[in-house]
């Protein structure tokens, strides 16, 4: 599991009136190992789930040859205070896989403690692994820590998408959550190639200042980790897609050591930001796999 920032360590010391942190139903675990032989389909070799996570099986609906989809289900209706959920996915040599969720993740209002959503992604030589969950909706007074750790081989590719939506867009004032922190760290052969964070704590500073999200509400991020790809070509292909998205402001940055690109999208509507992130994902797919993304049929 990724390191926990000091602020969230202090939150974690707060007692809960209901089930404690890591208690029954609050310690969600999902583990999966995938492998592929030659040009055959990618197979799920091993999986383990612990409530509230559930996996019905794999889906073979992706247009990319040999790529299998894991749609992770969570029937509890959202994430509550004290929840600690972790995902670990390993794609062995040559495997191709996409991990998604059945819907958005709703982080409910809190009175104490915090919720932690942690993901560890490992991609072996020539593997292609995508982690593209639904948006994260953070409600009033909620504290949410999201951490993603990536370890990939030089010939592997890993794509990670994230869309943050403040719950105030529907019922109350935007940015009235307590604390939201999302961080990704990626390593290739033990070298740190990407370290990025979105840390929003309205009590310490207005998220709408010009140096943060300005007049926007929704934050979308896409990481395309591809050490052997042409970073300049990849960035240009993604950037060209944003010409068709007038409702958002977006940018593309090259990662250190020519290990890929990161994309940030800002908007006022979650649908606009999600569409732009999906378009950027599609552009990266075309460059890396020669085929576009699948239709969004999770619902």
From Swiss-Prot:
InterPro entries: UreD
Pfam families: UreD
Predominant location: cytoplasm
UniProt KW Cytoplasm keyword: yes
Assembly, per entry: UreD, UreF and UreG form a complex that acts as a GTP-hydrolysis-dependent molecular chaperone, activating the urease apoprotein by helping to assemble the nickel containing metallocenter of UreC. The UreE protein probably delivers the nickel.
Reported function: Required for maturation of urease via the functional incorporation of the urease nickel metallocenter.
Recorded family membership: Belongs to the UreD family.
HAMAP family, A to Z: UreD
Protein name per its UniProtKB record: Urease accessory protein UreD
Source organism per UniProt: Natronomonas pharaonis (strain ATCC 35678 / DSM 2160 / CIP 103997 / JCM 8858 / NBRC 14720 / NCIMB 2260 / Gabara)
């Amino acid at each position: 599991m990724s390191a926990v920032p000091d602020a969230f360590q202090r939150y974690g010391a707060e007692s809960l009136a209901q089930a404690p942190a890591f208690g029954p139903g609050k310690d969600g675990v999902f583990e999966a190992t995938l492998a592929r032989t030659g040009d055959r389909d990618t197979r799920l070799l091993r999986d383990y789930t612990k409530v509230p996570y559930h996996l019905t099986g794999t889906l073979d609906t992706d247009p990319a040859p040999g790529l299998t989809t894991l749609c992770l289900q969570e029937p509890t209706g959202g994430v509550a205070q004290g929840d600690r959920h972790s995902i670990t996915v390993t794609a062995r040599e040559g495997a191709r896989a996409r991990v998604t969720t059945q819907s958005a993740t709703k982080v409910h209002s809190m009175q104490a403690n915090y919720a932690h959503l942690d993901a560890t992604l490992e991609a072996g030589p020539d593997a292609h692994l995508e982690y593209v969950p639904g948006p994260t909706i953070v409600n009033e007074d909620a504290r949410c820590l999201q951490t993603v750790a990536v370890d990939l081989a030089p010939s592997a590719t890993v794509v990670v998408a994230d869309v943050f939506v403040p719950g105030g867009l529907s019922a109350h004032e935007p940015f009235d959550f307590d604390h939201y922190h999302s961080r990704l760290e990626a390593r290739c052969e033990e070298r740190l190639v990407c370290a990025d964070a979105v840390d929003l704590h309205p009590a310490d500073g207005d998220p709408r200042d010009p140096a943060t999200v300005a007049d926007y509400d929704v934050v979308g991020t896409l990481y395309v980790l591809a050490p052997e790809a042409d970073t300049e070509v990849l960035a240009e292909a993604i950037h060209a897609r944003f010409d068709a998205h007038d409702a958002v402001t977006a940018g593309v940055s090259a990662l250190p050591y020519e290990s890929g690109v990161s994309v940030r999208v800002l908007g006022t509507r979650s649908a606009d930001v999600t569409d732009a992130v999906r378009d950027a994902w599609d552009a990266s797919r075309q460059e890396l796999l020669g085929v576009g993304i699948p239709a969004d049929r999770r619902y």
